[in-house]
Amino acid sequence: SEASLAAANSKKYESAIVGAVEKFSPRLNVKSWGLTTRNVANVVTTAMNAHPEVVYVARYSYLYDQTTGKVVYLKFSYKPNARTEKKQLDAAIAEVNKQINTKNMKPAEIVLAYHEFLTSTVAYDTSGAKEFDPTTGRDHMYDMYGVLVKRSSVCQGYAETMWYFLRKAGVPSGVAT
């Protein structure tokens, strides 16, 4: 079935999608993946949600064969300042990694170290819900860029940032929505 095919290859798809986006590719050939108009949204959303560090995609779309319903290409559009934001976020992540050395820490110590870092360096964004702009998003109040570069975010940004660092440190964790 389509669902089982997508599930069986989800890590492969995730890697290819995120790899293309990290290179700012405008499109990705997915013809051989067997994606359809019914499962493409789930595959792309799952891949993007697994990578909170990817904050610069404005939207995606797809091209498909109208006869078969099979998706041929994924198309990505990026925020106007995407390359700059990626560089800034990468630098901020590197700075956190410099400040927090998890090498000889137990999992609970790692959680505490990142928690202390985030709660002591990031202000909670109390500006209220902003209008969603499909090109620029919500000024990063919900993501890692808001947390690590702007130093201001709501709970979603904190949670995704914590999840990112804990996964990188090998500490099992997840984000509840």
Segments from the language model and where they lie:
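Hydrophobic/aromatic-rich core segments of domains that either
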Residues: G157-T177
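Secondary-structure boundary elements
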Residues: R83-V147
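Secondary-structure capping and boundary motifs in well-ordered enzyme cores
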Residues: H140, V147-V154, Y158
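Ordered hydrophobic segments in well-structured contexts
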Residues: Y73-K75, Y145-G146, G174
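Polybasic, low-complexity, intrinsically disordered segments
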Residues: K103, E109, Q156-G157, K168
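Linear, non-domain "peripheral" regions
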Residues: S1-K98
